[in-house]
């Protein structure tokens, strides 16, 4: 159990630590492609095949389990539900971040106008026609102008940005690529959360299966294979969490939660080993359904949110070297994870 815990923790930690180091951009793209291949192979080769094996077991009754391809059906349902959850969660985060950004821009715009507009005196605009009457500058009108302008009082903004902790580069970027940056950040957060949900459910099943096993001849090779299995899955998940750029506490919690799920499953399996029958109808159905659902989640995430998002991007299409490296790492990750199915 310790080897699985260490392997999972090491795998998920490497990408998180890598974000703190000045690594080559091509290497990072290769690592992302490798992780996508690992997740794709996990869904197809490990989870879907495991679900099919459990739900086609001879111990299950003929009706309804032999009358319909339930593993593939559950995987399809999971993929469609993941699409729906993906859409809803992304929309929630986008609305939340856009609201916070608008509030920040309005507040920032008002302060910039106070500092940089020569017609302002102590935060007020003197109206010559009204004989010196004072009018407060309209915050919303200025903010709207602020959103659609790429340059506005550089000296005043730089002075303000230093005091407010907003860098000039970040501000300029939000104007030029605000929607793209917002969407990209939200997508990475959603992907990391849904991906962990799919991986964790599978890890618990693996742990319980290992915990209820009584044969040392079976456990030893399985333990080694599962250690590599957890390492590769952790590496893939860690890469997605690193891209989400969560707070250090949030990243650590996701990594910790992944690392302990399989050992917890092992502990549960060991505790119920005396009364657990892995060939009972309830156990086979639970294992088959959960594996099939997890397969649908991971296949969707791998193809839609990881492979399509990167391999169909503009950056990939204009750089042949990056294309070659990414495809090689994608096939390598899928191949290595698939090979583990020989033992686990």
UniProtKB/Swiss-Prot annotation:
Keyword Amino-acid biosynthesis assigned: no
One BP annotation, GO: response to zinc ion
Key words, A-Z: Cell membrane, Ion transport, Membrane, Transmembrane, Transmembrane helix, Transport, Zinc, Zinc transport
Cytoplasmic side: 22-30, 94-188, 243-251, 313-323
Coiled-coil annotated residue ranges, if any: none
Annotated source species: Arabidopsis thaliana
Residues in compartment: Extracellular: 52-72, 210-221, 273-291
Protein name: Zinc transporter 9
Keyword NADP attached: no
């Amino acid at each position: 159990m310790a080897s699985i815990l260490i392997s999972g923790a090491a795998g998920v930690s490497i990408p998180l630590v890598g974000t703190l180091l000045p690594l080559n951009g091509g290497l990072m793209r290769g690592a992302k492609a490798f992780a996508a291949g690992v997740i794709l192979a996990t869904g197809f080769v490990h989870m879907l095949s495991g679900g099919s094996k459990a739900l086609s077991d001879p111990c299950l009754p003929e009706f309804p389990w032999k009358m319909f391809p339930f593993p593939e059906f559950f995987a399809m349902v999971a993929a469609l539900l993941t699409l729906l959850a993906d859409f809803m969660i992304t929309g929630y985060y986008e609305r939340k971040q856009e609201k916070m950004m608008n509030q920040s821009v309005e507040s920032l715009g008002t302060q910039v106008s106070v500092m940089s507009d020569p017609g302002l005196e102590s935060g007020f605009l003197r109206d010559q026609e009204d004989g010196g009457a004072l009018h407060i500058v309209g915050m919303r009108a200025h903010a709207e102008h602020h959103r659609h302008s790429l340059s506005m009082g550089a000296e005043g903004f730089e002075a303000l940005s230093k005091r407010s902790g907003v860098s000039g580069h970040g501000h300029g970027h939000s104007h030029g690529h605000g929607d793209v940056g917002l969407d990209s950040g939200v997508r990475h957060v959603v992907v990391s959360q849904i991906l962990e949900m799919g991986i964790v459910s599978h890890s618990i099943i693996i742990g319980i299966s290992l915990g209820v096993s009584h044969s040392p001849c079976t456990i030893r090779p399985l333990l080694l294979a599962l250690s590599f299995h957890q390492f590769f899955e952790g590496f893939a998940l860690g890469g997605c969490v690193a891209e989400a750029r969560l707070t250090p506490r949030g990243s650590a919690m996701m990594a910790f939660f992944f690392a302990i799920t399989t050992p917890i499953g092992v502990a549960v399996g060991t505790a119920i080993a005396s009364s657990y029958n892995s060939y009972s109808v309830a156990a086979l159905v639970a294992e088959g359904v959960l594996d099939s659902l997890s397969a649908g989640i991971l296949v969707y995430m791998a193809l839609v949110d990881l492979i399509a998002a990167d391999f169909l991007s503009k950056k990939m299409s204009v750089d042949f070297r990056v294309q070659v490296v990414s495809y090689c790492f994608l096939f390598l990750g899928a191949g290595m994870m698939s090979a583990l199915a020989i033992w686990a």
